[in-house]
Amino acid sequence: GALGVTTSSGPGIALKGEAMGLAVMLEIPLLIINIQRGGPSTGLPTKTEQSDLMQAYYGRNGECPMPVISASTPADCFDAVYEAVRIAVQHMTPVMFLSDGYIANGAEPWRFPKSEDLPAITVNFKKGLDEGEEKLQPYKRDEKLVRPWAIPGTPGLEHRIGGLEKQDVTGNISYDADNHQHMVKTRQAKVDKIADYIPLQKLDSGAATGKVLVVGWGSTY
């Protein structure tokens, strides 16, 4: 019933890959924070680098999608992490947050916001069975393709999830090829739909249309 958070950099993120894949399969909220440094291997552990973007997207086995968010400045880390938490708990997904050594060692004046000024993060825990539901269907989805979140130990909502592929809706273990293909596409579609709830980005400068678009991210934005 709570959000998991883990932080590392370099090879430490590689070691967490198996658990990240499990979180994708379980469809549970998890925040993975990667403070990027020079690599590969031990590499340049005290120097900054933005070299883990492809790892954040694809560094897990199988079809294993998750949202990736990056901060641009030390102050932006607060807003970016806050947004990552919102996405994780409202869309039942692990989220990768990318910072780097330059940001981590940076400093700037920043006013800590009042809690009442922050956008609300609403979490809808499942409290009981729906009408006509005999037992919890752990992979029954809403319009956002998000499965229900029942706090472990809630009477009447006992269920089982794990790393083996699950049958759609019921959550029973399934080796059926058609079901696996359906679940792979559904997990990807759920992550893709998150974009429907994020405002369109604005151009910093230049014309609204053109042949070339320059996109910056992270500390080199």
Task: Outline where the language-model segments fall.
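Flexible, low-complexity linker and terminal segments
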Residues: 80, 85-221
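Short, surface-exposed connector motifs at secondary-structure boundaries
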Residues: 2-5, 64-65, 207-212
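Thiamine diphosphate
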Residues: 1-58, 67-88
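Low-complexity, flexible helical/coil segments
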Residues: 17-19, 40-45, 64-72, 103-108, ...
